[in-house]
A protein has these predicted regions:
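Recognition helix of helix-turn-helix DNA-binding domains
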Residues: 191-224
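Regulatory sensory and allosteric helical modules in signal-transduction proteins
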Residues: 54-98, 103-106
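The N-cap/first-turn positions of alpha helices
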Residues: 178-182
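Short, basic, alpha-helical segments at the C-terminal edge of helix-turn-helix-like DNA-binding modules
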Residues: 222-233
Length: 237
């Protein structure tokens, strides 16, 4: 069964088709409610989510956003710093420290499930949380096998989603040869002054090309521009 979903996820031609295959895979693994988010960490701002899939109850999701639970959600916080999958119970086994966390976790209807954190270079990340629909006794029997299967599906779906997003970016924001050159040398750690000497142009022109690339890629720093260009397949280093 899982092998079938692997093939279908890899073959998904757009984000909507991929989300549908991901949802079907989650159902087959007895997941009652899931969330998938992907984006990047922004210096001084924290995580910025670019894609989000969920089958969560709209009323709960609305309350979650209105109350700002995402800022103190212990599952999210743990997922941003851990590198291996973990159970909801691993987090909820200790009492919350903040009143906001206590409020959220009292209202949170899911106590057993799995979080799969996924981290890539240059601050890219993805995260899947999956609340089980299994009865408590079956969950205890099967949870490690379920964790392995959900983790594989999450990793494959996230990789494919990143690839599709990169293809869309490459089509929407083509970079000029000069913009690519300045980003390529930036990726090698060269300063604007050094890039100017290498390319035989002025430092001001280097900054202009880098700034233009940043605008096209919708990022705020040179490092983010390099990361996004590499992820999109626009830049080979």
């Amino acid at each position: 069964m899982i092998e079938k979903f692997f093939c279908e996820i890899r073959a998904a031609s757009d984000q909507s088709a991929l989300e549908a295959k991901f949802a079907a895979a989650m159902r087959s693994l007895d997941v009652g409610t899931y969330n998938y988010g992907a984006g990047r960490m922004v210096a001084g701002e924290g995580p910025t989510v670019e894609r989000f899939w969920t089958n969560m109850d709209p009323a709960w999701l609305q309350r979650y956003v209105e109350r700002g639970y995402q800022r103190t959600d212990r599952l999210v916080t743990a997922g941003l710093v851990r590198v291996t999958p973990f159970f909801f119970e691993d987090v909820f086994c200790t009492p919350p420290l903040l009143p906001e966390q206590q409020e959220m976790e009292t209202m949170f209807p899911f106590k057993k499930g799995i979080v799969v954190p996924m981290h890539s270079p240059f601050g890219r990340f993805g995260m899947v949380s999956a609340a089980t629909a299994l009865p408590a006794d079956l969950w205890e029997q099967k949870k490690f096998g379920v964790m392995a299967s959900i983790s594989l599906v999450a990793l494959l779906a996230h990789q494919r989603s990143e690839e599709l997003a990169a293809q869309e970016l490459a089509a929407d924001a083509p970079l000029s040869e000069r913009e690519l050159e300045t980003l390529r040398w930036s990726a090698y750690g060269k300063t604007s002054e050094e890039i100017a000497l290498i390319l035989g142009i002025t430092e001001r022109t280097v900054r202009k090309h880098v700034g233009s690339a940043m605008a096209k890629l919708d990022v705020k720093t040179r490092v983010q521009a390099v990361a996004k260009a590499i992820a999109a397949g626009l830049l080979k280093i």
